[in-house]
């Protein structure tokens, strides 16, 4: 056996190139779904007779669950083998995609999207951790560059691809086209994916996970209800207040835990804080435009989905 042949945590050799290919294809499919539905919003509003504030939950709910899963994944990566975790994440994503593809109503479609988000929330940070584990330090820059291209390219293609499919086929085909690729990735991963990240026995703070879910979920629901109910609505005010309270409790708990669910002390660094704020503002602008522009172009100007 060559000295350069990589081995997993059990000392068994594996093909690093094939493993990376499987990871990147799977990541492309999962990340593509983040922006795949925005162009289809007007079509889905007509299909299910729902408002814009309702249909936007297909994206905001997806991003919320995705965000909640990322810190949980840090615990999962150290607790379970990377092979089993990747197979589980892609299986969950497949179940969510099938649920969306067969959804008879909007509620089922939303549930499918949230299931998809659980899989994506695990697979994305897992990809980055695996890349750092299987490449030596001098090659990690190139490896992260490859994953960055996929993570950046997939969301950029999503709206255009969605517009073409909506104009020429059925909205269900947005999920139908992904199904065979995900199945192929699962089959390849079963044979090619290896356990490459050393395991430990970490603990997770369940209360922090609950506080963050309720806090960010309430805040997001409150803001999303403004379009229908207005800023003076007791429902809107109530959810916003609950969200702020739970987020404050969550933040206080993180600052007093020895091993926090989410490390907030990094915000002591002004450089990190500025970068985080800029990234947040940029993301808000991008996601906001991705949701509003298709509605304006299609519903107000009467243009096609592909044009929007």
Descriptions of predicted regions:
Residues 179-198, 213-225, 242-256:
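C-terminal membrane-cytosol helix-exit motif in multi-pass small-molecule transporters
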């Amino acid at each position: 056996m060559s000295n350069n042949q990589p081995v997993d945590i059990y000392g068994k050799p594996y093909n690093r190139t094939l493993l990376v290919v499987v990871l990147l294809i799977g990541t492309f499919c999962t990340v593509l779904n983040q922006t795949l539905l925005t162009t289809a919003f007007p079509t889905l509003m007509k299909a299910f007779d729902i408002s814009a504030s309702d249909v936007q939950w297909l994206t905001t709910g997806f991003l919320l669950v995705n965000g909640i899963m990322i810190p949980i994944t840090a615990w999962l990566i150290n607790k379970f083998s990377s092979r089993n975790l990747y197979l589980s994440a892609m299986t969950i994503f497949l179940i969510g995609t099938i649920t969306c593809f067969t959804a008879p109503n909007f509620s089922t479609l939303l549930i499918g999207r949230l299931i998809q988000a659980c899989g994506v929330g695990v697979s994305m940070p897992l990809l980055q951790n695996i890349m750092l584990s299987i490449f030596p330090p001098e090659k990690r820059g190139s490896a992260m560059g490859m994953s960055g291209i996929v993570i950046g390219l997939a969301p950029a293609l999503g709206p255009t691809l969605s517009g073409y499919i909506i104009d020429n086929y059925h909205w269900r085909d947005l999920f139908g086209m992904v199904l065979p690729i995900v199945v192929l990735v699962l089959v390849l991963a079963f044979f090619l994916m290896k356990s490459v990240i050393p395991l430990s026995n970490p603990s997770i703070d369940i209360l922090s996970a609950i506080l963050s879910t309720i806090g960010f979920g309430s805040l997001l629901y409150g803001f999303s209800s403004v379009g229908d109910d207005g800023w003076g609505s007791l429902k809107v005010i109530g959810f916003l207040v609950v969200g702020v309270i739970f987020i404050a409790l969550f933040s206080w708990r993180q600052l007093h835990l020895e091993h926090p669910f989410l490390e907030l002390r990094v915000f002591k660094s002004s450089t990190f804080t500025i970068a985080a704020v800029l990234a947040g503002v940029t993301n808000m602008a991008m996601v906001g435009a991705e949701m509003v522009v298709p509605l304006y172009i299609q519903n107000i100007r009467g243009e096609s989905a592909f044009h929007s």
